[in-house]
Amino acid sequence: PPPAPVRDFGNGPERNAEAAGTEQSATLRATTTGVPGRDHDRGYPRRTELPLPAANPADAAIKLGLIPYHGIAPKLNDLQRRGDRVSVEVIGRSHQGRDLYLVTVTAPESRSEAREQSRIRALVENDPARAARDRRLPARYKAPIFVNDNIHGNEWEGTDAALRVIEELATSTDPAVADLLGRTRLYFNVTANPDGRVAGTRANGAGFDLNRDFITASQPEVRAMRQVMIDTQPVAMIDLHGYVNGTLIEPTTPPHGANYEYDLFIRNTYANGLGMEAAILALGHTPGKDGVRPPQIPFRDSAEGWDDWPPIFTPQYAPFQGAVASHTIEFPMRVNGSDYVNLPVEELRRRSAINTDIAAAAIRATYGFVRDRHDALIADQIEVFRRGAAGEPAREVPLGIVPGFGPEDVYTTTYPRAYVIPAGPAQRSATAAARLVDHLIANDVRVERARRPFRLGGTSYPAGSYLVDMRQPKRGLANVMLEPGADISPRVDAMYDISGWSHALLWGATVDTVTGGSLRVPAEPVLAAAPTGSVPRTSGPLALRVGDAQEVRAVNDLLAQGVEVTWADGVAVVPASARDAARTVAGRYGVAFARAGAARGVPLGRVRVAAAASADELFTLREMGFDVTPVSTAVLDAGFDWSGVDVLFVSSGLNHAALGEQARAALEAFLATGGVVTRGGTGAAFNTAAGLLTATPVAGRGDANGVVRVTSPDGSLAPAPGGHSFVYSPRWFTGLGPEVKVEQAYAADGPLVSGHWRAAADGTGGPDAARGQAAVISGRDERGAAVVLFGTEPMFRNHPKGLFPQVATALYWSAAVTGAAVTTP
């Protein structure tokens, strides 16, 4: 058997060692500016004369003999001119502003024919029971296929393979190709990550692994891909990656996502996987001749470690938008990393040519699979949506449905009747609730708003509350985001990536689960959440409780405008003279001010942060409006000016022991007047080495992650919404000195709600050891620094939105705690 595949982490454990550079996330771009909206009823071809990017001789693809980004637009313009089968549209822009190209290959369609395809696609989703009864529907419907290329920028060859296949289909005179294009539409996202393609990096220009972002959608490239899948509703999709030798073809090992219609999914995905394997073997590559091992299918060939549990990856998100066959393919011959630097160009190009051939074979096999199973795949997609709309119980997949499917592969869930996102006093954050509603809608989950008060599941709700009826076609996606998740620690030892998440528990809003009963609620569908910003009409100073990231943005916006802000126990108070500015930010960020009255606090200035942080944390800090300068051991050693810094944030890439004498002296001087906030192992080590707070950090198992229960005392700097937080490589603190206060602790009755957290082989580092232990602590160093240490992951991949204010509050407190108390006028 092939060696067990090893997956590369993205924004994972390496976040504790590699500080984001100054080039990452320099600004938050308005990446969709100037991108035209798509007219889904236009006929085909849809010819677009793409603007030509400037030539870049440093494009990393050139060394491999592959097409540089600046060569793609002229190639696509030429293919559009050469026939009537190829259409190109710009679907968005990357973080750094590069166009994202969607290519559609299909037989020509008039506007009325395109409108008919849209009507059928809508029928399949919106009235699947009727679609299932329409025996003529498959013959009239072009089955959509989605090919996603180059989502990891330094896994290049999918783009070149896609362009090769597009040209073949565009120019072929084979009647079989004409028949294929008359019965399908093939959609190619030619390069999902142009920033990374040019730079030769896995991540995009903001430092994000895009293939970890699908249920967060923090990045514009992911939002574009998400919309393509919603708009096209593919029956099959493949996502082209590298590098695993032999070629890795999904389906995956357990654990399997519990919210899929897995009986339909595994039957089709395994069949297409076998077809791709055969096509790749037919190329004739061998270990002896080429260094290419035979393909491997994790479901068949591995026990665990390459799973489809979290919906953060493209092929694991696509089934919720209707794909009944969905795959990652990893071509075999590594050309990135040290190989890119050290191997001769001739060898790199030999490897890239093999990878391109293999990727092209996978694309051809997939469209052949859809051609041969056209009607059955459409029927299975209809069945996915029908089960959701009917509210049927989750089905347990029969053992042996495909060879090797055993008890270890069976994962199920129980769908509730509905979720309610309350309005009124029961809602801890109307701002967070609005963000969650908008996120659900952006994912094509149906949300309604109650027109009148109602009672459901034994609870009364006011008008304006939001309702997610789980009898809807995409109930799997709604549930995978809103359910608490599951503790899968007992079932597997190794996981591919994160194992626990929950928008309901981590995004700051109150979400109620309704398990049964009749749903007679006077409600109407919504396309966006209702506005939440307000300023009271009464005179006097205004108060804004900072419990959501949008409230942090509002405070930082006011500070940037020069508004005098007083900080008092988690509340920002602004004077009556700033009412107009408050009204502006209330509308801009959807935040609600209240009347302040008299309050005692400390003056808060614009908080300037030096951050030795991971790319996702740097992005999140800037998204919240903080003025952030990236630093690292090397930056400090080069001579750093601390005069413009209020707080040092440390989570990655700063080793106190490695600092030179001058850098250490400058840091010591800063600690007499500045604050420190740290996160994770690197942050805890910095605290110890710098002699800040008296505390012993204890490490949980390194790959442990998930949603955890926590407790926070009144007045905590780290109040946890609903009593939950998130961990990845968790830490806790023991041996606390008298200067240390516990701001947050892991639940004494066991912390893990959902995810994967086992003890290490020696029995240490498990969740039982963390019971009742300090997760977040604060205190004053004798030199003057106000310090906060996080053992949790409050900004992980920009995902746990409800936890961001904990970091902001720590930064505000750390910057302002030395100020004298004042009375707000």
Please annotate each region the language model reported.
Residues R140-N148, T159-A206:
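Short helix-loop-beta-strand segments that form the rim/entrance of peptidase-like active sites
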Residues P175-D179, L210, S218-P220:
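Histidine/cysteine- and/or acidic
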Residues N204-F214:
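Short, charged loop segments at secondary-structure junctions
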Residues P5-R93, D99-T104, S110-R111, E116-W156, ...:
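Intrinsic-disorder/low-complexity accessory segments
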Residues A162-I166, V222, R664, V807:
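Amphipathic alpha-helical segments in well-structured domains
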Residues N189, G196-A203, M237-T253, M276, ...:
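Core alpha/beta catalytic barrel or barrel-like domain that forms the active/cofactor pocket
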Residues P1-P3:
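Secretory targeting and sorting signals
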Residues S218-V222, Q227-A282:
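Active-site-proximal loop/hinge segments that shape catalytic or ion-binding/gating pockets
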